[in-house]
Amino acid sequence: MGYYSDPTSSRDLLGNRTLLFIFVCAFAVVTLVQQILYGRNYYLRRYFEFYEGPLEFNSSKCLELRRGITDVKVLSMVKQTELFERWKNLQMCKWEINVTEANIFKSTLFRCCNAPAFLFTTQKNTPLGTKLKYEVDTSGIFHINQEVFRMFPKEMPYSRSQFKKCAVVGNGGILKNSRCGREIDSADFVFRCNLPPISEKYIVDVGVKTDIVTVNPSIITERFHKLEKWRKPFFNVLQNYENASVLLPAFYNTRNTDVSIRVRYALDDFESQQPVYFFHPQYLINLSRYWLNQGVRAKRISTGLILVTAALELCEEVHLFGFWAFPMNPSGIYITHHYYDNVKPRPGFHAMPSEIFNFLHMHSKGILRVHTDVCNCC
C-alpha cells in the first residue's frame, strides 16, 4: 500500500535548517563585532571581574591603561562613553606621583608664570606708582596709589613647594555623595572656588577646611549688592571659612576693581583678620597663554584651572576634587552641574571639557590626582 508524501515537508525541513544556520552565523557575527567594537576594554572588563584589589601604578597593565588616556591627543578623537570607560578602568590602578614628570611640569610653569612670585599683587612685584594693565581691558591702566598699595602684602605669602599635600576643590556635581570631606580636610592646604557652601548639609562630601577661597566680583554684585549698603551678610558668609585668605580678580577689568577693594574695607569694618589678596593680572595673562597652547580655547580659563595651576607650583602633591565637566559621571549616571545646585554656566565662556581632559592626562602621567570615585579616607 503506498503512502502519501507531502512534497512540502522536505522543503520545510530544509528551510528550518537554513534558518538555524543563518541564526548561528548571525550570532557569531554579532559576537565578533562586539569584540571588535569593545576591543581592549572588553578584555579589561573580563580581567577586572576576577581581580581583587588595586594594581600598581607602574605595572604593565596600568601603563597600558594610562596610555589609553594619554594616547588621546584631542578630546574629539573619542566618544564620551569611550573616554569614560577608559577612565573607569584606570581607577583600578593605585595612583602615585611621578616626581620626574611633576618637576618637569613645575619647571614649565616657573618659566611661563611663576606663581610663588606673581600669583598675587604684592608691594615687591607691584611698587607704588606702577601703571598696572588690566587683564582684559588691556587699554585700561590702574595707577597704584598709596591707598591700594597698603592693601598689598609686602611679598608673596607662599613659596615654591611649600605644602606637601594640597586639595583643590571644585564645585562639580561629581562631589555629591562622594564622602570625600575627610580626605579633603586631611590635606595640608585647601583651595576653594567662589564661596561654595560648606555647611553641615555638605560637609561629609566636601569637607570644611579652607585656606584660600576665591570670590568672583559678580557674586558680590548679584548676591550682596556691591557691598554698597549691607555688608554684614557678606561678612557672615566669609565666617564659614574661618581664617581663610580671600582672593579676588580685582584687576580683571575696571568694573572689578572698586568691588574688590570694598571687600577689603568690609572686612576692616568688622575687624576681621582674614587676609585679602588680588590676582596679579600679568600672571593671569601668562597663564591663559600657556593653557591656550595646551588646547584650552575659551574667553577665559576657569577659576578652578587657575587654582590648580598655582597649586602645582606651591605644593609637592596636588589632589583635585569636584572637577568634572560632563552631564554624566564616569558610570554614565546623570549628575547636577554643581554639588549644591544645577544652575548651568554661561555657554562658551569657559572650556571646561578641555580643562578636565588636560587634568585626566596629568593624572595619567602622575603629575596630579583627579578624584571622581567615592572616597575611602581615614
Where are these regions (language model features)?
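Metal-ion/cofactor- or nucleotide/acyl-coenzyme-handling active-site neighborhoods
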Residues: 2-378
